[in-house]
Regions:
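Short glycine-enriched nucleophile-adjacent loop
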Residues: 57-70
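The feature captures the conserved acid-bearing segment of alpha/beta-hydrolase catalytic domains
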Residues: 76-185, 189
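Active-site rim elements
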Residues: 17-23, 165-171, 203-204, 208
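Alpha/beta-hydrolase fold nucleophile elbow
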Residues: 43-54
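Catalytic nucleophile serine of serine hydrolases
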Residues: 54-55, 86
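C-terminal catalytic histidine-bearing segment of alpha/beta-hydrolase fold enzymes
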Residues: 150, 180-214
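Alpha/beta-hydrolase active-site loop
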Residues: 2-42
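Stable alpha-helical elements in mature extracytoplasmic
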Residues: 27-34, 56-59, 175-179
Length: 214
């Protein structure tokens, strides 16, 4: 079992004095197992889509970058697609964050938030699973992975006292727009061969509104 948020970062399961466990496992390792089981048991499988909403979408975006099952299953011909929806925070690949979120074209530079680059918001102090994947592989995989970012037009929430999240933008809506722009800043426009962002008209922080949209 995991705490309220450890699971969406791929952290190890818990082993406490109150609830002892014989071993610990990363939540991302469980996803690896599920991927392999699906492909091994369904020979005609053509596509796997992993989606999640809010806290779940934080797992989707990080597993899309650092998950290892896909790397060992490329020869199967299965198409892997990730669809995070209304995401509260993202994984950045360097120390730069948006300088002014109130402008139409975003620019990026250093931030005063000392925790901004700590995992799960950045690439410093990666947990065990992500560390085993490695920063170079994480960065390369994210660029080459099919990811569709969905965000509600009216998802204005997500404020927190955590500066590492707030320097990504004031709300979930603006964070998604900023991050999508950041991808082009970091990788160049070729990243958009695999990455898309769609703002869902009329939707707020509501999964049903997102998935029932056209």
């Amino acid at each position: 079992y995991w705490s309220d948020s450890d699971w969406n970062a791929g952290d190890l399961s818990r082993d406490t004095q109150t609830n002892p466990r014989p071993f610990r496992i990363s939540s991302f390792s469980t996803m690896d197992t599920i991927y392999h089981k699906l492909i091994n048991n369904f020979n005609s499988l053509e596509k796997i889509i992993l989606t999640g909403h809010s806290a779940g979408s934080q797992m989707v975006v990080r597993y899309a970058s650092g998950g290892r099952a896909e790397l060992s299953l490329t020869q199967t011909g299965v198409d892997f697609i990730y669809i995070p929806t209304n995401t509260p925070s993202f994984l950045y690949f360097d120390d730069n964050r948006v300088l002014d979120e109130g402008v139409g074209v975003f620019d990026f530079g250093p931030t005063d938030c000392i925790n901004a680059s700590q995992y799960k918001y950045g690439m410093e102090n990666l947990n065990q699973y992500m560390g085993e994947t490695g920063s170079e592989q994480i960065i390369e995989k994210h660029k080459n992975t099919k990811i569709i970012y969905l965000i509600g037009q009216y998802d204005f929430g997500g404020q927190t006292s955590t500066c590492a999240r707030m320097v990504q933008g004031y709300s979930r809506l603006i964070r998604t727009h900023i991050y999508f722009s950041y991808l082009g800043y970091f990788y160049g426009d070729e990243v958009y061969d695999n990455s898309q962002m769609i703002e869902i008209p009329g939707a707020s922080h509501d999964f049903n509104m997102i998935v029932s949209s056209e």
